[in-house]
C-alpha cells in the first residue's frame, strides 16, 4: 500500500476532482448515444424504448452502488481485499441474473407493455436493451475491484485516464456510427458498452502492480472483514442510490400514460 502523504486541501482536491469525473462521465456519455438511437427505424420512439431498458438496468445496478465505498474501507489489506473481491463477484452474479429476469417471458410483457405502455415492437427493443445490457452492467461491477485498489493507493488520476478514454470512445462512436449507417438501439448500446469494456481493461492494467503488492501482504480473514460484514456495510450505502434510480422509473410509468408519451419519455431520458 502506498504510504499516505501529509493531508492538505490541495492534495485532497487533486484526489477528488478525478473522482468527480467518474460520476459526471455517466451523465455525459448516456445522452451522447441518443443521436445513434434516434436515427433507428422508429426514430425518437426507439430512444424511448431504449431508455426504459436502460433505466431498469441502472436501478438493478444501484443495489451494488455501495460496493465502491465498501472496498475503500475494507480492501486495505490482503484478507479484506480477497473478501471484497468475493462479495463483488457474488453481488454481480445475483444482480445480473435479476437484470435478465424482467427481459424474459412473461415478465417482459408485464413490465414493458403493461408497466410502460410500450407497443410490442418497442417493448421488444426495451427487452433486448435490458438483456444485452448485462455486458455493460457487468463491466461496471468488474471495474469496482481495480478501481478500489487505485483509489486506496491515491491513484485517482490513473482511474481518470481510463474514464477519459471511455468518454472519448463514446463521443467518437456518437459521431461516427450515424455516418456509417449504424443506428438504432443495438448500435447505441454497443457504443456505450465498448467504452465501458475498454475502461475496464485500462483500469485493470493500471491496478496490477498495486494488486500484486496488496496480495503479497500477510493477513488472515476475521469477522471484521468477512464477506457478510462487508455485505451489511454495503446495503445502507446502496439504499440511497436505489431510491434515486427508482424515481425516474416511477416518473416514466406516469408519463407513459399521457398524450405523446413516447416523445416525452425520450426527453425524460436525455435530461
Residue positions per predicted region:
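Residue-level recognition of membrane-helix boundary sites in multi-pass small-molecule transporters
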Residues: 46-49, 128, 157-158, 187, ...
